[in-house]
Amino acid sequence: MDIQMIQLTNLSKSFGGQTLFQDVNLKLSPGQKIGLVGRNGSGKSTLFKIILGEESYDSGDVSIPKNYMIGTLKQHLVFTEPTVREECALVLPEDEQWNFYKIEKLLFGLGFTAEDLDKDPMSFSGGYQIRINLVKLLATEPNMLLLDEPTNYLDLPSLRWLKGFIKEFEGEVILITHDRDFMDSVTTHTMGIQRKGLRL
């Protein structure tokens, strides 16, 4: 039986008089991890926004299975809780709100210390604030990860940790990164945006 997966069918998108995609088709397989490549301005981030429902498209169809959860790394740095630990726990389901172990494991993996957990999220540098958002994303355990330049601001140990996490992640991944070594080490396929289409 065919497992229902996210699917793009005959997708077309123009932007400012320029055609980014024309009749693009994509059907992900379970566990597939795709590295998306293409020159700047080719539409990689726009494709992410279309999948997330944040950007309209001219024609075609985006099919997302019911209850299929897509997670993406937010660049907006808005924090409401007094400590890093409590901020990250916000994303947990109500019955897991106090499962700090799950949160702490992710925070430690991304370079936070035990002392950091009780600090104000706003007291950290922009790079570490992005990591807090990355922890919040990973803690939600989505079916699919859309990661746009997730290696920015990461030091070597955190990079290694994220690499291991993505490799072990059981869901689907589409990744945009300029770090080709990182991409090659975590993806199963590379897909290019070329001549207004997607090519594996």
Give residue spans per PLM region.
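ABC ATP-binding cassette signature C-motif
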Residues: 1-200
